[in-house]
Amino acid sequence: MFLRQEDFAAVVRTTPLISLDFIVENGQGEILLGQRLNRPAQGYWFVPGGRVCKDETLEAAFARLTQAELGVRLPLAAGTFYGVWQHFYDDNFSSEDFSTHYIVLGFRLRVAESDLRLPDAQHGSYRWLTPEQLLAGDNVHENSRAYFSPDAPAVGL
């Protein structure tokens, strides 16, 4: 269920959101990043992902979000669970009036680049980086870098 913008703003203002992040790896061990067009994290390079909707199973969310973010519908079994993560942002989808808090379920995926049909609705451009390049990238968001940080727990929390 998608909410009207006013209702969604009330939810974001008062509760954490649940989302899925996809750590997509190609055959060369590079990770897919997209440059975000929207708040929060606008302008930063970020792994693909998105929110789970109310009354949506994780299986349905995974299939919907892989289609929306990668251009290919994948089953939950295609991913390897990579832990629970916390993302905090000073802004939100519409303004800087209030913060956004996500509880994120990370999933690692190996996908052939030729299978992807990367859409432009959420990301202006895409690139593949090695984990080392990703960690060194100034404009790679800290929440995406955290998936590869040597200081990060092995599985999120």
UniProtKB/Swiss-Prot annotation:
Signal sequence segment: none
Key words of the record: Hydrolase, Magnesium, Metal-binding
GO molecular function, one term: magnesium ion binding
Binding site residues for Mg(2+): 49, 69, 122
Motif Nudix box per UniProt: ranges: 50-71
Cofactor dependency: Mg(2+)
Membrane-spanning intervals of the chain: none
Residues binding substrate, per UniProt: 2-3, 8, 36
EC number: 3.6.1.-
Cofactor note (record): Binds 1 Mg(2+) ion per subunit.
Reactions it catalyzes: GDP-alpha-D-mannose + H2O = D-mannose + GDP + H(+)
Domain Nudix hydrolase stretches: 3-153
Family that this chain belongs to: Belongs to the Nudix hydrolase family.
Role played: Hydrolyzes GDP-mannose.
Record's subunit section: Homodimer.
Annotated protein name in UniProt: GDP-mannose mannosyl hydrolase
Organism of derivation: Salmonella typhi
Name of the coding gene: gmm
